[in-house]
Amino acid sequence: MNYNDEIKSGTSVAGFDIGENINSYLPYLYLQEVEVDRVIFSKGKSNEIHRYIIDKNIKINTSEKGEILNISCTNTYYGKYKNMLYLGITVQEVISKTDKQVIMFDSLFVNQDYGFCFVLPYPYNDIDYISHLPKDLVLKEFIVGRFEKWFRK
């Protein structure tokens, strides 16, 4: 687990890889005496989402079988997405460093990349346009996953 790793859209963050099984990481985490909490969410009659919360900072959502679906980071992360976006950036900086911004599903996506997004905090999570966000709003959470299916027509 490395808080300095590059944020790779739809692929990985902090040394965890989308699509891999969480069970391949747990022995290492326990050996390092990292705090790991697990919460199970029901998603319909037969599907469950398992969330592993690591050091109260990284949240990894997995399928019932342990496949990593997405990874979110809050509070502390030093790596960057494409060497330009990072945790703690302002909305104004995102606008100035990217060509296109889209708000969907309470999240801010950039440059039509649907593998990385910033989560909009309350009360801004119901806003539809980036122009309606305060320019000095600090973005304190991001998610890496494979969200392309959300945007298919």
Regions found by a protein language model. Name each.
Residues 1-153:
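Short helix/turn-capping signatures at newly exposed starts of structured segments
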